[in-house]
């Protein structure tokens, strides 16, 4: 018998009849405000990006209040479906965190900023496009990391449905390589310790590059 119990602390409904997957969720301090806790960033296949700042107060009867309208910092409709959301240092000459969003035909990097710079009711947040890259093939997934052991910067790698791996060094395109004996796209992960990419091919073999 476990001594621990799980209980609902905070819940939000993300739209109506929208679809999501695991890569559409990201957690971090997207507002870059040290006085704030981490935000929850959610993107949907309908192209809606939402940013939540969850807080919770306990009532006298021991229950939790849960979601309130001011917990949603941003709701933004994009032109394309959102396949993947990442948070990292994606802009050169800046140590701030930015939101990278993968769409079927492009990847874009955005800045989240509030008019007062504080998490308080009434603060207006906006999403600003920093840059974007058009992809040569429809995308499947992406990863980010300190490729090449670089410090204080995050680079992006996008896997296309044609087996391509396209690398971007922040605002600049770096290069494209193709996975050998490729048939279908699969999971992709970056291993910082070995500075390598790991994937699984269609023969169910784990490959490290």
Model feature map: region roles:
Residues 1-209:
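Beta-propeller-forming repeat regions
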């Amino acid at each position: 018998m476990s001594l621990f119990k799980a209980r609902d602390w905070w819940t939000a409904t993300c739209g109506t009849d929208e679809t999501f997957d695991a890569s559409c969720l990201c957690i971090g301090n997207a507002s870059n405000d040290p006085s704030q806790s981490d935000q929850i960033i959610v993107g949907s296949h309908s192209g809606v990006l939402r940013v939540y700042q969850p807080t919770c107060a306990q009532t006298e009867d021991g229950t939790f209040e849960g979601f309130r309208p001011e917990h949603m910092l941003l709701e933004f409709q994009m032109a394309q479906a959102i396949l993947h959301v990442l948070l990292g240092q994606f802009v050169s000459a800046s140590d701030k965190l930015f939101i990278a969003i993968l769409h079927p035909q492009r990847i874009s990097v955005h800045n989240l900023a509030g008019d007062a710079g504080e998490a308080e009711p009434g603060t207006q947040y906006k999403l600003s496009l920093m840059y974007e890259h058009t992809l040569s093939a429809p995308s499947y997934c992406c990863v980010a990391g300190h490729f090449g052991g670089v410090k204080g910067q995050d680079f992006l790698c996008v896997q296309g449905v044609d087996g391509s791996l396209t690398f971007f060094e922040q605002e600049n395109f770096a290069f494209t390589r193709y996975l050998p004996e490729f048939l279908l796209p699969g999971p992709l992960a970056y291993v910082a310790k070995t500075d390598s990419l790991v994937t699984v091919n269609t023969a169910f073999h784990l490959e490290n590059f």
